[in-house]
Amino acid sequence: MTHSLRVIFAGTPEFAAAALAAIHEAGFPVPLVLTQPDRPAGRGMKLQASAVKRYAFERGMAVAQPPSLRRAGKYPAEAVAALDLLHATPHDVMVVAAYGLLLPQEVLELPRHGCINIHASLLPRWRGAAPIHRAIEAGDAETGVTLMQMDAGLDTGAMLHEARVAIAPDDTTATLHDKLAAAGARLVVDALVELERTGALAATPQPADGVTYAEKIGKHEAALDWRKPAAALARQVRAFDPFPGGAGTLDGATLKLWAADAVPGRDDAAPGTIVDIGPDGVVIACGEGALRVTQLQKPGGKRLPAREFLAGAPLAVGQRFAPADAA
């Protein structure tokens, strides 16, 4: 099936690529794709294209990669060129998903139907850069995807559609990301079909209550504070998989702790102390309960199940991970 609604797409990572693929496969014309410039990545720090760029290039779509869209910003010449291209490209609506660049008011007002953002939370909860991580870290039972009509604020636009997604007890950011990406892809296609058919989408202002912000994830957040309850640390480990992981310092070496669950603890063990070692994992005392770690990684090594890790790097009951503020 083909459609007449012309969609400019702006996005960068895999989450956005899923939406672009769904829009393209549904038959909507995509005359232009915006994505961030290639970035150094991997051990060799070679320039790598974004997931959105790779998808668009493979299908012969026009791609632009401006470092900014702000005329008065750091890259005015590149911004002007990109804005001129947007003005010259006939389109009806812009779909934005994890693009990573600020859209100035000029861009927000350019499409006939405005700019629609795909946001990975149930707004107004978890506005901001890391909604998937923060939902898991906070212990939310569910999250979802919200389509909103973009305005000048940070994820403050009126809500158009939403899809709810349960957070499973073993969900990591990686697994929940994939669920939300699929939900967002379906949601935006349904919205575009409706927009084409009716000429408008019903918009509901976000409620003033329940606003929370999902701050960007920093590498320093990997450190586990063993004084916290084990349940909170288990959520932290899941929330920060694949980045930045959970981390603990043992005898001067930083170990990555990748998969973990909360188990009953011992009252006589100081937080951070290894209280049990077995084929199912390494059990570490916490401020409340204990954390059973089932996947570990030593510096320069690979992520391994506990049994394989212990075969090459034996640990002992009684060893103690350093406090987070002393690591």
Swiss-Prot record:
It catalyses: L-methionyl-tRNA(fMet) + (6R)-10-formyltetrahydrofolate = N-formyl-L-methionyl-tRNA(fMet) + (6S)-5,6,7,8-tetrahydrofolate + H(+). One of its GO terms (molecular function) is methionyl-tRNA formyltransferase activity. Keywords: Protein biosynthesis, Transferase. One of its GO terms (cellular component) is cytosol. (6S)-5,6,7,8-tetrahydrofolate binds at S121, L122, L123, P124. Its EC number is 2.1.2.9. SUPFAM superfamilies: FMT C-terminal domain-like (SSF50486), Formyltransferase (SSF53328). The keyword Amino-acid biosynthesis does not apply. It holds the Pfam family Formyl_trans_C. It comes from the Bacteria. The keyword Translocase does not apply. Attaches a formyl group to the free amino group of methionyl-tRNA(fMet). The formyl group appears to play a dual role in the initiator identity of N-formylmethionyl-tRNA by promoting its recognition by IF2 and preventing the misappropriation of this tRNA by the elongation apparatus. Belongs to the Fmt family. This is Methionyl-tRNA formyltransferase. It comes from Burkholderia pseudomallei (strain 1710b). The lineage of its organism: Bacteria, Pseudomonadati, Pseudomonadota, Betaproteobacteria, Burkholderiales. The gene is fmt.
